[in-house]
């Protein structure tokens, strides 16, 4: 059960989301997905792993990409995929392809063997070494990568290449 949804929040209230600090792939991709497709006014908090559950309860925030949470890894699926499913976004085939790429970057890439995944993983790792002050800054800087990947995925869907250009 998700703690908060777009439909049940009070008028003007922002959805709060919380995850582990020291972002990499899923903890950048998920906030991008949430802001673009779930709640444009969402707020994000990044805390030590052992504080995610307690801070989520205290703040009334939705935990994601943390051990044991509903919107986390399940089997070989990543948190991005869990959010796509929970918020019924799988009708957007470009998002489905993007989810496969994110999975390939965030996991061992054996579920889909998505060729674009390792490249995204390398880019995400590079952002961690550019000297940003905090996780919010990394997210702000890196979202352009997800905008570009989503545009790529949309083009692949238009061309009928639902598994991307390299498969």
Question: Which residues make up each language-model segment?
Answer:
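Intrinsically disordered, low-complexity regions
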Residues: 12, 22-25
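Conserved, aromatic- and glycine-enriched, well-ordered alpha/beta core segments
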Residues: 17-20, 27-91, 95
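Extended hydrophobic/Leu-rich segments
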Residues: 3-6, 83, 102
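Short, Lys/Arg-enriched N-terminal segments with co-localized hydrophobic residues
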Residues: 2-14
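A charged, amphipathic interaction segment
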Residues: 85-167
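Active-site-proximal structural scaffolding
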Residues: 26-27, 139
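Glycine-rich, often proline-containing surface loops adjacent to acidic residues and nearby aromatics
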Residues: 13-16, 123
């Amino acid at each position: 059960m998700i703690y908060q949804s777009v439909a049940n929040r009070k008028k003007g209230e922002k959805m709060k989301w919380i995850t582990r600090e020291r972002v990499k792939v899923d903890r950048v991709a998920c906030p991008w997905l949430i802001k673009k497709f779930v709640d444009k006014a969402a707020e994000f908090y990044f805390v030590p792993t052992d504080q995610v559950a307690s801070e989520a309860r205290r703040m009334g925030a939705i935990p994601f990409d943390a051990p044991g949470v509903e919107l986390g890894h399940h089997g070989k699926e990543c948190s991005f995929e869990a959010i796509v499913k929970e918020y019924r976004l799988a009708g957007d085939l470009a998002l489905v392809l993007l989810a496969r790429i994110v999975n390939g970057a965030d996991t061992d890439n054996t579920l889909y063997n998505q060729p674009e995944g390792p490249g995204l993983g390398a880019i995400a790792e590079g952002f961690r070494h550019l000297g940003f002050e905090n996780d919010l800054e990394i997210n702000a800087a890196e979202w352009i990568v997800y905008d570009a990947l989503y545009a790529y995925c949309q083009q692949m869907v238009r061309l009928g290449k639902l598994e991307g250009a390299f498969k």
